[in-house]
Amino acid sequence: IRKPSHSGLVAIAVAAALSGVAHAADKPARAPATIGDLKPRAVEIRKEQKVEGSAARAIDNYRRYLEQKDADPELRAEALRRLGDLNLEVGEGERIEKEVSAIDRSGAEAIELYTSLLKAYPDYPRNDQVLYQLARAYETTGQPEKALATLDQIAERYPGLVQRDEVDFRRGEILFSNKRYAEAEKAYKRALDAGANGAFYSQSLYKHGWSLFKQGQNEDSLPSFARVLDANLTDRSNGDKLRPIERMSRADRELVEDTLRVMSITFSYLDGATSVDQFVAKRGVPPYSYLLYSRLGDLFVEKQRYQDAADVYRAFVARDPADENAPILAMQAIEAYRKG
C-alpha cells in the first residue's frame, strides 16, 4: 500500500478541519471604543494576542491545500476565507510590535485572498463576513476610503447583518475623520437602531452628538450627549440614583467626563445657567443634574468668568436647596465671587 505524500496528508487534514466547521457561525470581535480627552477620536479595537507558530503552520497548511487542483469548491472557498483571516490576525499581531512592513505584507495578502474569494465565489454564503474582514484589512493597511466603500457595500447588501451596528459605527468613524460630519451623523444614527443593549450604543450616541456639534448645531447635540449620561450615570437597578463615576471602568469614566465637558462648553455658548435650568427641566431633572451645573461653573472659573460661575452654582442651589450637594455649590459660588 502506497503511503500518501506529505502534501496529501496536509490536504486530507485541512479538508477534514474545513468540512467539520465550514458553516460554523464565526463572529468577528467587537470591542468598544475608548474615548479620551475633549477631542473625539476613533474607536480603539482591543489588541489581539500575538499569533504564535501554530498560526504560521496553519497558514502554510491552508496554502498547501489551495494548491490542490481537485479541492472541493466549497471547501476551497472556506480555506481562502480562513487563510485571509489568519493573515489579517498576523498583521494585527505585528501591529502590536510596530513591525509596519509585516503589517503591510500580511494585510495585503489578506486583501488579495478576500478579493479573490469574492470574485471566484460570488454566491459563497459567508460573503457578508468576507466583506466585513476585507474592510478590516483595508483599515489595517491604512486605506480608509476603500474600507468605507466596503462597509457601504455591506450596509447595502446585508441590512440584517448581526454586526450591522458596528459596520455603521465604523462608517461613521471614517466619515467623521474625513470631516464629513453630516454623513457621519447619519451613520451613527443608524448604528443606534441596535438599541441600548448594542455594543456600540454609548459610543454612537457620543459621536452622534459630536457630529451635530461639528456642524454648528450646538443645542441639537445636547440630547445625544444627555443620553450618554442616561446610559452610564443612571443606576436603573437602584431607583434611578446617580452611579458614582469613580467606580466606573476607565473607558466609561473617560466617556462620561468628556461628555460632561462638551456639554459644559455647549451651555457656555448658549445662555449659561439659564440654559442648564431649561435643559434639566426638559429632561425631568435627571440624577446627574448636579454635575451639569458643577461642571459648567468649573468651566467658567477656568475661563475667569467668575460672575457667570457664581450664577451657575447659585442656580443649582435655588433649584434644589435640599440636595446634599447644594452646600458644596453654595460655597463654590462664594469662592467665585471672592475671585471676581
Regions found by a protein language model. Name each.
Residues 21-340:
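Acidic, polar-rich low-complexity tracts and alpha-helical solenoid repeat scaffolds
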Residues 11-19:
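Bacterial N-terminal signal peptides
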Residues 1-10:
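Bacterial N-terminal signal peptides that target proteins for export
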Residues 5, 14, 144-147:
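Terminal low-complexity, poorly structured segments
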